[in-house]
Amino acid sequence: MTIIKSKTLKIDYFSYIKAFFNLMKPRVMSLVIFTCAVGLLIAPEKINFSNAVFSLVAVALGSGAAGALNMWYESDLDSLMTRTCLRPIPTGKLTKNQALVFGITSSIISVVALYIFSNLIAATTLLITILFYVFVYTVWLKRKTPQNIVIGGIAGSLPPVIGWSIATNSISFASISFFLIIFFWTPSHFWALSLYKADDYKKAKIPMMPLTEGIEKTKLYILVYSLLMLPVIILPYAINFSGLTYLLPAIMLTIYYNFICYDLYNYKKNNFDLKKAKKV
């Protein structure tokens, strides 16, 4: 009897921890860690290894905190959508209050920790990122305009700037150039996602581009934003921050991305191919 109870407690405890981990949007968090680490590594100044690791952990926690607050606010929408109905709050694994407390607490800890292990500029930029994602994107824009992805993309584009500021205690045009690359990539990627998740967004009454402007215009906007990446991708080279070892592969990859987006656009009018959309 005791053994059975012990096993049950272990399983429940593990499930509880897993629920909080999923609340932090681990996929998004991993992308944030990666882009922040890139910003940190390409910066001209270096910090010691332990500070770099603790700083990245703080940024990861900040990203997770923003994700938790997003799920807290959008739990009503998440329960309506196939893509999100298995998240911790809709499934009852966590309550809204637990998500709110966790999100606020983690936000504070992450910003304070980043200030301790790096500097005020990095910590302030992280704070701005969290606040922008939660209040500007989640609360204000997402339910009101199809431009939610464009403006809200500012938050998702800031991690390289944070990484750069961790190492240099500054924000430069070089770090902003990498911010712009992610900023112009974001709309095309997420509008492609919204094409094949349109039914989900319709259920939740989220005004994504395919629902407000139609499939054809969405495909056009995807192509336009992918083409805008070409001049932006050249910026690090144009400001003498990077050399040809960056420029040539970057241009080749961007042209390939342009081709993928054009392939999606060139499909049947007012229709799209699922495989082509998923490639974007």
Where are these regions (language model features)?
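Cytosolic, membrane-interface loops and tails of multi-pass inner-membrane proteins
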Residues: 2-15, 73-94, 191-218
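Multi-pass membrane catalytic core of lipid/isoprenoid biosynthesis enzymes
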Residues: 83-124, 214-238
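Intramembrane alpha-helical segments
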Residues: 96-167
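C-terminal ends of transmembrane helices
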Residues: 76, 132-145, 190, 196, ...
